[in-house]
Amino acid sequence: MRQAKIERNTFETKIKLSLNLDTQEPVDIQTGVGFFDHMLTLFARHGRMSLVVKADGDLHVDSHHTVEDVGIALGQALRQALGDKVGINRYGTSFVPMDETLGMASLDLSGRSYLVFDAEFDNPKLGNFDTELVEEFFQALAFNVQMNLHLKILHGKNNHHKAESLFKATGRALREAVTINPEIKGVNSTKGML
């Protein structure tokens, strides 16, 4: 089974995270940041993976450290669970509509970290969640998985729908990329490693 457990403890956050790419249950997200819990649940469900997160952060300051550190821990867990990446598709792309919004995620589990984030939010907040943290999360995730991740809102108005389409699209693209393809012998790279 492709799975991992990560514990990350700093002066700002304490995070326990477990991930299994080969089963879909359980999904249980408890970060103390309601909107973020909702987004991570969508990410896991649409990525068809088990994800359990328990985070205690300095929410009396704001949710920045919690969101970023969960992104770091999730990225580390994905990298660990993927191991040598033998037989995986490597690439994944997904377009996800959410009412008036259309979001896209395209990624490469190349071992090279890069994020292109082309999404604008009309308001700085979604409830008590800072919309700038959407990009912060994906930055931490991409750099710790060591993947190229391109995210784009092609069109849309509602900020909730924009964020939701990006989290769902990333989960779906990741599912495509991590799927083991029997047609791929070894690692899907002319270098012989990812």
Swiss-Prot record:
Gene Ontology terms, MF aspect: imidazoleglycerol-phosphate dehydratase activity
Organism: Streptococcus mutans serotype c (strain ATCC 700610 / UA159)
Protein name in the entry: Imidazoleglycerol-phosphate dehydratase
Catalytic reaction(s) noted: D-erythro-1-(imidazol-4-yl)glycerol 3-phosphate = 3-(imidazol-4-yl)-2-oxopropyl phosphate + H2O
CDD domains: IGPD
Record localization: Cytoplasm
Cited PROSITE patterns: IGP_DEHYDRATASE_1, IGP_DEHYDRATASE_2
Family in the record: Belongs to the imidazoleglycerol-phosphate dehydratase family.
Record carries keyword Lyase: yes
Pathway given in the UniProt record: Amino-acid biosynthesis; L-histidine biosynthesis; L-histidine from 5-phospho-alpha-D-ribose 1-diphosphate: step 6/9
Alphabetic keyword roster: Amino-acid biosynthesis, Cytoplasm, Histidine biosynthesis, Lyase
One Gene Ontology term from the biological process aspect of the record: L-histidine biosynthetic process
Superkingdom per UniProt: Bacteria
One Gene Ontology cellular component annotation held by this UniProt entry: cytoplasm
UniProt-listed Pfam families: IGPD
Coiled coil: none
EC numbers on record: 4.2.1.19
Major place of residence: cytoplasm
